[in-house]
Amino acid sequence: IDACLVGSEMCIRDRPNNIIISSSTSGFMMSEIQTRCSTPERTVIGHPFNPPYILPLVEVVGGKKTSKSAVQWAFDFFKFSGKEPLILKKEVPGFVATRLQEALWREALHMVDNGEASPSDIDKALINGPAPRMVVQGQCMAFHVACGEGGMATNLDQFGPALKWPWTRLQAPELTTELRDKMVNGCNEMAGDTNFEILASKRDEAIVSVLNALKKKS
């Protein structure tokens, strides 16, 4: 982190004050990087996902001293560049995608270590199961559509107790009313006025397209 701090200050020192300075770090938080910056308000993280020349995601993260205008400028820049930027609502190590990936990775390591599955078993399960579906809808929307008209509300009310079951080594958060409402409202907002049957139909068509494309490739 010390080298990163020195490098960031050297970079900023030679740039005009109206230039946004972006870091592609995948681990450090901008609040740490900008501690020695003379103009920290223009420093922001633009974290791509590997391979960045194919995948469109870029996570935009400001630090405690980053200005809102710098965050918005970075978002607009990546959007104009053809990427799909995502502004984090709150600074957190690992951002969004890496934290989700790390959770999956750690559970996979546990399964291999305990002799429950081989690396090949794990990849086969993902490739032929949740992965194609997640390409189409993502984790939250997939569970929302899976419960029909009731959506995420039905999912959490019916399967909420399963969060205490030993299906993962990760400890689940308490399913409070606030957390339930955030999930339900978020999924309803994504779905909009589209009926769940249409959402499910579009999901199925897209998954078939993904699977057919993979078959042709192999």
Where are these regions (language model features)?
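Structural/interface elements that position substrates and couple domains in central-metabolism enzymes
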Residues: 97, 101-107
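AAA+ ATPase "lid" subdomain C-terminal helix
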Residues: 102, 112-114
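Helix-to-beta-strand junctions that scaffold the AdoMet/dcAdoMet cofactor pocket
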Residues: 15-16
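Rossmann-fold dinucleotide-binding core
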Residues: 20-90, 94, 98
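Single conserved hydrophobic/aromatic residue that forms the stacking wall/gate
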Residues: 1-7, 12
